[in-house]
Amino acid sequence: MTVCIIGGGAAGMMAALTASECGHSVLLLERQSRVGRKLLATGNGRCNLTNRHAAPAHYHGEEDGFCAYALSAFDVDATLQWFGEKGLVTVTEDSGRVYPYSNMAGSVLDVLRYALEREAIDLRTGCTVSRIRRRGDGFTVETDLGSFAADKVILSAGGAAGSKVGGVMDGYQLAKQLGHHRTALYPSLVQLKTDPTYPRALKGVKAEAGITVRRGAEVVTEGRGEILFTEYGVSGPAIFDISRAVSAGGDGLTVELDFLPDWDDETTANWLAQQRAIAAGREAGTLLTGTLHSRLGQMVCKAAGFTTQRADSLTDGDLKRIAKQLRAFTLPILGVCGFDQAQVTAGGLRTDEFDPQTMQSKLVPNLYACGEVLDIDGDCGGYNLQWAWSSGHLAGLLME
C-alpha cells in the first residue's frame, strides 16, 4: 500500500515512520527545504518534546475530548520508549517537562531524520502540494514537482503559527478542496501586547504572578506562573497559557497581575506595615525591596502614586493603595503578537469530521489528518508535541 504524507513536521514524521514500520510504502512531502524546522524552535531551542502530565485537561478545541483516545493509545511512556529505541536519551524536570539529555532540539530532529533514512522513506523536500484529487478508492496528489498516486493520504501540514519556520495555511485549503471545514483560527502560546508605559521600563524583569484577564467586571480567563516583561507587553509561560483566550476574546480586555498570589489581603497589609518600619528613612519606592525585583517594586509604588516620599511617612491608607497595585497591577491589552510569533494555532480542521480512534476522515475514506492542522491545541510545556506524536502515530497505523 502506498501512503502519501503531506507535511514533514513532528506529526508528519511520526506518521511516516509508523506507516513504514507497519510495512507500507511511504512518500513524505515537505514544502520547506528540510523536515522539522519548527521542531528546532521549540523549548527555546531545547525541544520540550513531551510532558509527564499530558492529559485531555491540557488541550483545547471545540471538542476537547477528541484528543483523549490518541493520548492514551500512544501515551508519554510509549512515546519515550519509541524515541529511546531510536537512540534518544531524555531527562524529566520536576515540572514534568521532558527534554533531550543534550538540551538541544537538534538531537530530537537528528534521531527522526536518521530513522527516516533507515526506513528508506521517499522524502521530497521543497515540494508544494496544490491539490489532492480523488482517484477511485485512492488519490492523486498534485505538486510543483509532479503528481503522485497514493492509496491513502495523511494530512499533517501543520497550522498557521510560526510562519518564519514553516507555518502555513496549506493544510486547511487542501482539506477544504475535499469538503472539510475549519474553525476560526487564533494565535496561541503567544506574547501579549499591552500599554507599554510600565512594561517598557520593566523590560527583562521576571516575576511569579497570578493572572486575571477581564472585560470590565467579567473574568475572561485566569492563570498563574512566571511572567516576563518586554518592551511591548508581557510574555512568559503563564502568559502563553492564557493567550488563547485573549486571542479569541476581542477588544476591551485588561490583564491584572497579582505579585503576591499566595497571600490574602490581611497578610499583605501586615507585611506592608512591617516594610514601612524597616524602610524608615528611605524613599517609598524601596518599600518592596527584598520581595520583588527592585525595578518592579519601584514601578508598583509609582503606579500607586509614591516614589520620593519617605517610606515612614506613608499612612495606612497609602499602604492600601500600594497593596491594590501589588494584588491587581492592571494593564490594558492591545492585542497579541500574531501568528508570526505564536508557537501554535488555536483552531483548525473540525474534529467532528474525523474519527478520534483512527484519525480518518468521516467525509473522505482513506484520508487522515494529525497534529496542528486539526482543531486541537495544548498548553505550554510539551503538550503540543505530545499531541503531534500521539495523533501522528495513530494516523500512521492507517486503521479503518
Task: Give the positions of each predicted feature.
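Short hydrophobic core segments
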Residues: C4-I6, L29, V129, F148-K164, ...
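Glycine-rich active-site loop/strand segments that organize a redox cofactor
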Residues: N44-T92
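Glycine-rich FAD pyrophosphate-binding loop
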Residues: C4, S20-N44
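An anion/pyrophosphate-binding glycine-rich loop and adjacent beta-alpha core
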Residues: S33-V35, L40-A41, L49-P56, V89, ...
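A glycine-rich dinucleotide-binding beta-alpha-beta segment and adjacent secondary-structure elements
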Residues: T125, Q298-D377
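A conserved short coil-to-beta-strand element within the FAD-binding core of flavoproteins
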Residues: T125-G138
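Glycine-rich loop(s) and the adjacent beta-strand/alpha-helix scaffold that form part
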Residues: K152-Y198
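Beta1/beta-strand and adjacent pyrophosphate-binding region of the FAD-binding site
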Residues: M1-A11
